[in-house]
Amino acid sequence: PEVEGLPKVISELYRMILYKRQADDAEMKFLMSGSQDKLLQKLGNEITETIIASKNGEKDKVLHEMADLWYHCLVLLDYHNITPEELLRELGGKRA
């Protein structure tokens, strides 16, 4: 089943990420400072945690870790100046 407003939720979350970066948020400063190594390491950690939760059959933990993973994927999009709308267009092209 489709979640109504999912693109809106993603866009709002992305705007919050942009705001946090401009507001000098400590977590965002840590993830976005210098090279992308810290951000990629965090993304790798979230992927690993999601995989482990899935392997252990922990549905609630999979949901939590997947939310963290999506969040950090949005941070990575911001790092590369890619908007969620661009990503959604790319995903839309996968339906063809």
Language model: regions and residue ranges:
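Flexible "arm" and connector segments at domain edges
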Residues: P1-M66, W70-A96
